[in-house]
């Protein structure tokens, strides 16, 4: 059987061990480490596919749970799959819906068969199983699909986490058996286990034995301190095959992207750039800027003097502040564009630093300019 997803390792950074690679998908090949913008409902909020392409986005994310509810996976399938439905001819990854089931629904009951929960839109009772999650993702037609896993809260006890990862491993095997399009879609397994090294080892061992074409590290960026996330990555990524892509789910702050790459991660995704953009917060080479603040009312400089994105080439902080203060959609478009561009370009810089065997030096320079080295530094 030919796998639709292939990872090609190009170089390892001598200074850090970070990996430069190429992710080959049915819709193109893309350099890693990469940041994947999130388009929950088959759109990256306020941005067009053409804009994402001009930024250099390669793979984008869509959400199985949300698309199952609206418009329905049957409608997307009828349209010719997600690529045709949203006019995107590059890579797409869909998550399994597990995270939303565990985070959005107040009522839920976990059983061996699957999860019973309430629709967060109207309160209807719903059921999602490994088989159903894969069926929906087969219909959506993304290049990379994810196994259905349990997403335990942080913190969780060792006993609970052990039961959880063992269930997730059984569910992963059921996902593989249910997968109807293995020659067109790569199904990734998700390693869980919280902060417990022994459980991460057990989870990784179970999943690697099933020989997925790629692996995600799940259960991080759920409220734990950054030091815990980095420590977990340090003992988890070496457990995963070197010839398969490694995906850190739900992580998008600049410091975590760099620290994740240093610990062997190839793929990242997060709603962060568009979510904070809608609130008027932007990431710049000199740190975060809350554009609504009064100090920018007469600031006629670009958001980031070192950025060449469409927003920074054409508009000032004062103008963007005015738009955001007046709830103008164009303001949100401009901040979202800049933030997504910023993270895509950051990963270009990370890849170049790996080529030059100087990623640790780059990290130190970036952290110093951004302000991550200051006491009580913000997360983004």
From Swiss-Prot:
Pfam families per the UniProt record, alphabetical: TGT
Catalytic activity as recorded in UniProt: 7-aminomethyl-7-carbaguanine + guanosine(34) in tRNA = 7-aminomethyl-7-carbaguanosine(34) in tRNA + guanine
Pathway entry: tRNA modification; tRNA-queuosine biosynthesis
GO terms for MF: metal ion binding; tRNA-guanosine(34) queuine transglycosylase activity
GO biological process terms held by the UniProt record: queuosine biosynthetic process; tRNA wobble guanine modification; tRNA-guanine transglycosylation
Enzyme Commission number(s) of this protein: 2.4.2.29
Keywords per UniProt: Glycosyltransferase, Metal-binding, Queuosine biosynthesis, Transferase, tRNA processing, Zinc
Cofactor(s) needed for function: Zn(2+)
One Gene Ontology cellular component annotation held by this UniProt entry: cytosol
CC cofactor note: Binds 1 zinc ion per subunit.
Record has Membrane as a keyword: no
EC main group: transferase
Residues the record lists as binding substrate: 95-99, 149, 192, 219
Binding residues annotated for Zn(2+), in chain numbering: 307, 309, 312, 338
Domain of life (superkingdom): Bacteria
RNA binding: annotated segments: 250-256, 274-278
Active site residues according to the UniProt entry: 95, 269
PANTHER family recorded: QUEUINE TRNA-RIBOSYLTRANSFERASE
Described function: Catalyzes the base-exchange of a guanine (G) residue with the queuine precursor 7-aminomethyl-7-deazaguanine (PreQ1) at position 34 (anticodon wobble position) in tRNAs with GU(N) anticodons (tRNA-Asp, -Asn, -His and -Tyr). Catalysis occurs through a double-displacement mechanism. The nucleophile active site attacks the C1' of nucleotide 34 to detach the guanine base from the RNA, forming a covalent enzyme-RNA intermediate. The proton acceptor active site deprotonates the incoming PreQ1, allowing a nucleophilic attack on the C1' of the ribose to form the product.
Similarity comment text for this entry: Belongs to the queuine tRNA-ribosyltransferase family.
Assembly notes: Homodimer. Within each dimer, one monomer is responsible for RNA recognition and catalysis, while the other monomer binds to the replacement base PreQ1.
Name of this chain's protein: Queuine tRNA-ribosyltransferase
